[in-house]
Structure formats: C-alpha cells, structure tokens
Amino acid sequence: MTDARLELAPDRIVAPPWARRLATLGAFVANGAGIGCWAAAIPRVKADLALSDATLSVALLAFAAGAIIAMPLMGLFAHRLRSGPASVIAGFGFAAALAAIGFAPSLEALCAATFVAGATHGAMDIAMNANASDIERRWGKPIMSSFHAGFSLGGAAGAVLGGWLGGFGTVWGLTGPALLASLLVAVSAPVLAGEGHGFGGASFVAPSRRLLPLAALAFVSMSTEGAVGDWSGTYLARSGVAPGFAVAAYAAFSLLMITGRIVGDRIVAAAGTRATVGLGALIAGAGLAVSATWPGLVGGVVGFGLVGAGLANVVPVIFSVAGRTGPSSAVGIASAATSGYAGLLIGPVVIGAVASAADLRSAIVMLAAVALIAAAFASSRAGGLARGR
C-alpha cells in the first residue's frame, strides 16, 4: 500500500545486506576524506594565492553556498537517479572539484571550484544519508551512527594524508586524497548502482510540522560543532595555553566524537532516540560550561571532549528519524541537513559577533545555554523524537 502523496517505485536491490552496508559506508568514508583534505589544504591555498582573511572567507562562503543550495534540490536528484547512483555521481564530482581547487590560479577560479565542491559534497551527503536510512530500515536496528563514524574516520584520514602530501605542494595535498576517495566510490559503485528508493510524486516539499523540530535540533547541533571547530583553539590560546597545545581541545572533541559514533548504534538501541539526543545535548552543554568555568588546557580538553561525546550521535539520530518522517528518506534528510549546514555556517559567525561585543568566554556560556535548552526540547514530545528507536 502506498502513501497518498507518493507512488513508491519498486526497490532495485540486487546485493546482500552486508554488501549494501559496506558500499554505503565506503561513500561516507570517501565524503569525509574529501572534507578532511580540504580543511588541511586551506592554509596552503591561502598562501599560494596570497589571499587575505577577507578574500579567503569569500571562497569558504562559496563552498557553504554550494552545499546549502544543493541539499534541498537533492530530493529531485535522488528522485531521478535513486539515492545509490546519485551518491556515486556526486562522489566522483566532489573528488574532481577538490582536485580542481588545487589548480585554481585566481580567487575567481577558486570560488568557482569551491562552489562546485560544496554543491557536490552537499548532494552526496543527502544521497548517502538517504541510502543509509533505507538500509537501516531494512536492517531492523539502529546502524546510522556507524555510517557517521566512517565519515569522521575518513575526515581524520583525509586531513592527515592531505597534510602530508601537501608538503609536496597544494595540488598533491588535494588530488592525492581525492583520487583515493574516487577509488572508494568506484569500488562501492557496482553495489550502490542498484540502491535506493525512487518515487513518482513531487520530489521536494517544504518541511512539515514533524520535520521542523528535527531541523531545529540539527541547526543547534551543527552550529555548536562549527563553533567548536573554529573557536576552541582560539579560546584556549586566549586562556594562556601555548599555540602548539591549543589544538588539543579540538583533538579531544574529534576523538571522542569518533568514539561515540563507533558505539552509537548500541546506545541508540538501548536508550532510544529521544534519550540519546536529549542526553547528548545535555552532555554537550555541560562540556561547554566546564570549558567556560575552567579555562586552561585541562579544562579545555575535558570540556570540549565532552562536547564531542555529547554531539556524536545527535546528527546521526536526527537524520535517521528525518529519513523515516519525510515523504521520502531523501526529502526528510534534506530538510534536516540543510538546516544543520546553515547552522554550521552561522554558528561560528554568531560566536565571533558575541566575542567582539563581550568576550569569547561569554560566547561559550551562551552556546552552553543554547545546548541545554536543546536538551530540554529534545527530551520533550515537542522535539519530534520517540522514546524508542
């Protein structure tokens, strides 16, 4: 029996469940590796083109704009090609765009390349998460966090490999990881080609009342993640920590986020979606409060590490629920992901504005308060999360 709004097309699943899961995991690792190598290449790109902070921000904004524009349109893309093939096409496009960034001779060319990279990253993000949501539904138990653990591990590997190869030149730092990401996508492609749902009705709809709470939680979670990534090192440095050690805060954040995602499926299965998100946001808020009230290296590592542990499974759970809530997995996840990516862009800017008006510690306190409010919201019925999975 089909939904009244849609006419679901038959599934085109030809591979066994474990092969579908591994292939989709490969797409997550490839996507994370691309983001990691781009993050590692930013300082070298800035130096190669002699960009100021202001002009570099234009290129970074182009990447974000490409992603935000592509994500809501991915419902149409997944409708035409299904989420599996869409992941493959977007994955190859993302790798090619990353390689093109290394060859950009000017700011204009750089912005064009970063816009395409952002758009293909965003498209791949929606397609692979939609596919993961379908696989999780068939699997019969929570597995979304394991996919996001693959993304985080890929990001760490891409950053390390890109940083090392970048010593031989910016082009190597981007094309090397991009080629490996392409290889992962190519290996996964035969399975992904038969993956995903298609549907016969409208392929994109405005977020429904059931999706809006999930989109709001995604916005808060990813804005917090972006703020920690951009400001944790600066906060420790202003607290008197030597620059070489200030990176320890973000390292603790990333390590505990990866660890939390590796064990996240068991947590969700045992605690349910509402408790996982609510408690996770509470832990993140507590971690930010620790960092604000205990300045210095130890307080920063403990506090921001708790933030990583708390946020680890918030976005995977939200995407999983959104994929089951929307008219299709692609549309539901696109609604949450677009809001989340906007938060990733806006969060650091708001923290910077508050830090300029008051100080960075006050901005961290504000972020802690927002996380605690999100914890209360997620724990209530209004948060759109069930007590079970």
Spell out what each predicted region is.
Residues V14-A41, A47, F115, S208-T224, ...:
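Pair of pore-lining "gating" transmembrane helices in MFS-fold secondary transporters
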Residues W38-A39, R209-T259:
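Extracytoplasmic gate region of multi-pass secondary transporters
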Residues A50, R82, F103-E108, W294-P295:
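Helix-breaking motifs and short loop linkers at transmembrane-helix boundaries and internal kinks
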Residues I69-P105:
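Conserved MFS/SLC helix-loop-helix module at the cytosolic interface between two early adjacent transmembrane helices
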Residues A70-R82, G166, G260-T273, A355-S356:
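Helix-to-loop junctions at the C-terminal end of transmembrane segments
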Residues P85-A99, A275-V290:
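Structural signature of the two symmetry-related core transmembrane helices
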Residues G122-R137, A312-G326:
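Intracellular juxtamembrane helix-capping segments at the cytosolic ends
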Residues W172-P190, S362-S380:
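Symmetry-related core transmembrane helices of the 12-TM Major Facilitator Superfamily/SLC fold
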